[in-house]
Amino acid sequence: MFKNYPLLRSLSLYRYMPYRLALTALLFLGANISIALQQFSVGQAIDHLKHAESASIFAHSFTDPQNPWFWFTVIAVIASARAIIQYLGGLSSLIIGQNLLTILREKIFKQVQDLDIKWHWKHGLGEVLTRTTRDADKLKEALINFWRQVFESTLVVLVSVGLLCYYHPLLGLVPLLFIALGLSILFHLTNKMVVLDHHVGLAYEKISDSLAENIHGIRVIKAFGLENDKSNQFRYFIQNFIQRSVDAISFGARYLPIPQIIIALLYVWVMGFGAYLISIQQLQIGQFVAALLMANMLVFRIESVGQVLHIFADARASAARIWQMLDVKPDIQDGDIEPDFRADLGLELKVEGLSIQTETGKFLLKNIQTHFKPGQIVTIVGKTGAGKTTLLNTLNRFFDPSQGRIFIGSEQQGWHDTKNLKLKSLREYVQIIPQENFFFSGTLAENLRVAKPDATPEEMTQALYLASAVELLERLEHGLDTVIGDKGVTLSGGQKQRISLARAILKDSPILALDDSTSALDAATEKNVLQRLKSMSDLKTSGPQTPKTIIINSNKQTTIALSDWIIVLDHGEIVAQGTHTDLMQNSHFYRQIMGFEQPSLSPSSAVYEEI
């Protein structure tokens, strides 16, 4: 119903705090009724004081409404009560605002986590940060001001106009017409302000994107001497943001006074018509003063609404951007099966007729048919862009195929289509080490425990040994408790890869896929790591360990030398598969990508000479 009205839709967030919402509404109701009652009491006090001029003000009891002191006491009590109620209402409103901000950011963060990899490739970090910070803050401010300005001011208008009508119908109805006319103009101007703020938001995103890229790419910037170019580009984005902001502010400064002037005319009406009513003895002096106080309050409140409409305009654009993100449905939908596979028996993957096609019709993978078995190291080779990484990313459903299916299981334990498994369960069984070695800010132990939260120091040390990273551990001043910095900034490329391997080994998933995860290792280190992984994958020697199905994306001859099976990809299709010896004898394309172009070259000796 409210999908096309993002700001109104955001009011649904109040459902998470219904009792505090009701309490805040009652407090604001009491505070605003007390304002009108206080002004009404001022008029009563003036009128009774005038009547008491010819008699002692002490002629009546202090509890007698005929005594002006009664009304002075009422005014003092109302003012004191209103101060307390307003404080409690403001405090409750502030708590609601912070709760709303927390809920918004949690929703955005969860959505970002749930969205698939493809979405993240299309949307920059700056966009996500803008939604979580600037847009969420603006929406929170609008929702708080909804209480302080819209709800509260509506109550003030209703009560004040009601009391003015009590004095005389025209004294209240004509100001109501001024208010309606002024607000209609304000709302019309708001639509233009929303468009202007949308441009401000886009300019802010450019700043966030540029800042994130320049921080993450600082090494490339320094390597190519781009400091001045990037500084000038960032300065341009800032100037563009400033100009967009000035345009929005200037528009408000030019046009917002027009409806405010119209609304201010209601004060002139109350004063002029009130004076006329006094002249014909239909209004007393005290009532006239009370009417002026109410009119003044009406002007002040409606003018403040006009000022806050700029906040609402900003928030409408921000709310639209937030809900646009929250409404995205992930392409990768969670399954509902949690199979109880026995990992110690080994798991297999069967790929049947798998194809991935882009929106333009290009095939990234086409009719892939293969079988990954436990106790084997399977290497996927091919030229750059052949589809090696894409194939690996389908195994744990980073991507879903356009056609075909992937099955996990075994003849002994049964088979399941990976689309039917819960994503968390599937990724417990299939562990992929991506090309990018990402580390969280924290210690080495904290980053290793991402794979196994309850891992002991002994288990982490053993995983580092299997990944040939134990000597790195010995060099670190505080061992496992050493802080490795944001994204592992203190580590070299090879060290990052070995720690990533150790983290995956610690996970102990039955299926392990390495996406070119040994590219930064020297030949000797890579050989040690792969031989240890091979011993883990060997069903005969694994003992109590989980027999591994190991899949590697690599063109390195060191890797191929230890492979049991090789899959050759070209333009997304399997053009050959088999052992290294068979492929060297039977596949011209394989010999080309391996660099063996002379038929007289001995395949086996050439491979091991490179190790």
Regions found by a protein language model. Name each.
Residues Y16, R20-G30, N145-H199, V270-L283:
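Transmembrane helices of ABC transporter permease
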Residues A203, I207, K222-L226, S250, ...:
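Cytosolic ends of transmembrane helices, especially the final helix of ABC transmembrane type-1 domains
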Residues W71-R82, Q86, I179-L183, F187, ...:
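Hydrophobic alpha-helical segments in the permease module
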Residues R342-I611:
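ABC-type nucleotide-binding domain
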Residues Y19-Q44, W71, I75, G90-S93, ...:
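Alpha-helical segments in transporter systems
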Residues Y5-P6, Y14, S93-L94, Q113-L158:
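Juxtamembrane loop-to-helix connectors within ABC transporter transmembrane domains
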